[in-house]
Amino acid sequence: MYKTPIVFLTYKRPEETKKILEIFLKIKPKKLYIFQDGQKLDFNKNEKNKHTQTTKIIRNFSKIKAKKFFFSKNICQKYIGFKILNKVFKHENKAIILEDDCIPEYGFFKFCDLMLKKYVSRKNIAHISGCNLYYGTSKKKIIKEDYLYSKYPHFMGWATWKDRWNKYYDPNIKDWPSKK
């Protein structure tokens, strides 16, 4: 059983959602939080259908225990992550975060878990990312290292700690005037 809590944010990708839920069945997370954002008012028929399918998939997912949250209104991309992680971090000290457009390899979870443990006392490290943007167009590695430090966050399959979340993440960037 996988011990680090996992947060999964879904929207309107039914096929990807199914694939990710299959991965969860294999890794068996001890704690799984699933959030479904609400529909936008201007959704076309196809988007409404995909959103409805995704919601049904989540509602029917019962093979492992999960806390499920469904938003009746669309929160919007800018705020949904902040809203859900603020909720999760009332109960957890760390978490792995996935959206429905990020289908991870199994090793991603072990990598995040190891890095969360390794860097727990390094307060200048805000998060661990499983995003791999460092390949060229030929799919050949641009960098030789297995992982790197970056001052730029990559929010495509990532993990963080409660204290870092509370310190570094602000959707309104209130301290921007002092950082310019």
What are these regions (language model features)?
Residues 1-98, 102-180:
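Peripheral/terminal regions associated with large enzymatic or DNA-binding modules
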